[in-house]
A protein has these predicted regions:
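Active-site glycine-centered loops adjacent to acidic/histidine catalytic or metal-binding residues
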Residues: 53
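Feature detects long, helix-prone N-terminal segments enriched in hydrophobes
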Residues: 307-417
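Non-Sec secretion/translocation targeting segments of pathogen effectors
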Residues: 411, 420-425
Length: 425
């Protein structure tokens, strides 16, 4: 039984959690419905990935901010026209089942790359600062990576278990559930670019939340070479979209962040909106130091080495982008001979540009590509330029039959001996 179907128990639970956590009952109520909608969509749609600010609070426990939107996408395997087509009717069915209303249903379309479903719920607790509408956004424009499995739960569910009411939590189906979620590292990268984009578009309203989220994420995310590689890969993906201004080749992200700090363009919105959504206080002057850390780290500076070694491999059809052959790279030899170890190309070096039907490799300086077909060396020790020419000159079928999907590629860069990695199934 759903808790909101029992009005008395629901009211009592919301009030108890509100007192226990010192949070507005209107926030507790909305969080319940946000979690419920998320859970049901996750149960019904295969390949779903949860991302954005709500994933940071609900799954990663990285921020102390109430986030009211549900940001969803599909993984690369399920990002098909057929799967996109079922998303809208599934969300409609779920809302009808839960007694919720989609206010803008006529403005949504099946198979569209972006939809925002504005979902209203039966309101018991009013608060002028809380919009009683859940925004469930489905975005199928950019590939979502990396991802991991986390648990999600409502504030009511967490409070019930923490206070020994496990039986009641189970009775009202308020137990945690597993969901695929975008990693904190990727979300941090997205938020830095988004903060710059909204400033350039002069659209600061309700977007100062990114400043707070960046500040909190920096407590959990390590700014290292892997993170820098991720920044580069995301930038390559974003720059093909016209509204992603800060990802364009001529954009200087550190300079844009410096402008955010110096102009204080987000300060008013932070004071009026973001601060009111925090469970724990964090003033603007404290949060803005996160941008200074990003600037000082150099993670978003243009990387000449990566720029020089980025190559695009055209693919004949969109379908072939979803699955491709196994590529490997190895370190440039110092003695003229290639070593006994090669590296399966980690996800951080490979991205997929669906709009241009291309596989994109971002290779660090002094690396070369080694291409194999599962039986013998097809070509070894190609330079980046030679590799691009070699692949472009041959049909994909020339490289054997083993298919490795992007989600299956190694992301840790662990070494594999030549004689074992290529023939294993």
């Amino acid at each position: 039984m759903r808790l909101h179907k029992n009005k008395d128990d629901f009211t009592e639970a919301v009030q108890a959690v509100s007192r226990g956590l010192n949070i507005s009952p209107a926030l507790i109520e909305k969080d319940y419905y946000v979690t419920l909608v998320l859970k049901r969509i996750n149960e019904e749609i295969s390949g779903l990935i949860f991302k954005g600010g709500t994933s940071l609070s609900k799954c990663h426990k990285a921020i102390n901010r109430f986030s009211e939107d549900i940001d969803l996408t599909l993984d690369s395997e399920h990002l098909t026209e057929g799967q996109k087509k079922i998303v809208k009717p599934t969300i409609v069915k779920i809302c009808e089942e839960l007694g919720l209303t989609i206010n803008n249903l006529e403005n949504t379309r099946s198979r569209r790359d972006y939809n925002c479903y504005q979902i209203s719920y039966p309101l018991l607790f009013e608060n002028d600062e809380i919009d009683p509408v859940i925004k469930a956004e489905t975005v199928f424009i950019q590939e979502c990576y990396p991802e991991e499995v986390k648990q999600a739960d409502s504030l009511i569910g967490e409070w019930l278990k923490a206070n020994g009411f496990t039986k009641q939590a189970e009775e009202y189906e308020l137990i945690p559930f597993d969901i695929h979620v975008q990693t904190m590292e990727r979300t941090l990268v997205d938020k830095v670019f988004a903060l710059c984009d909204y400033m350039l578009l002069d659209d600061m309203k309700k977007h100062s939340r990114h400043i707070y989220d960046i500040y909190q994420l920096l407590k959990r995310v390590e700014l290292n070479d892997d993170f820098r590689a991720l920044v580069h890969r995301v930038r390559e993906d974003r720059k093909y979209h016209s509204l992603c201004i800060s990802a364009q080749d001529n954009a200087d992200v550190p300079a844009l962040l410096k402008r955010v700090i110096e102009t204080g363009c987000y300060k008013k919105d932070y004071e009026e909106h973001t601060r009111t959504m925090l469970y724990a206080p964090c003033d603007y002057e404290e949060a803005i130091t996160g941008l200074e850390k990003i600037i000082d780290s150099g993670m978003f500076a243009k990387d000449e080495d990566y720029e020089r070694n980025t190559i695009h491999i055209s693919v004949s059809s969109a379908a072939k982008i979803a699955s491709y052959k196994e590529y490997r790279l190895c370190k440039m030899p110092e003695n003229g001979k290639y070593g006994d170890y090669t590296y399966k190309i980690p996800n951080k070096y490979v991205s997929i540009n669906r709009s241009e039907k291309a596989i994109v490799f971002h290779l660090p300086k002094d690396y070369v590509v080694e291409l194999r077909n599962g039986r013998t060396n097809q070509t070894a020790g190609l330079t980046v330029t030679e590799f691009a020419a070699e692949v472009a000159d041959k049909d994909e079928s020339a490289y054997g039959t083993k298919i490795i999907r992007p989600s299956q590629l190694s992301s840790d860069g662990n070494t594999h001996k030549k004689e074992t990695g290529f023939n294993s199934k």
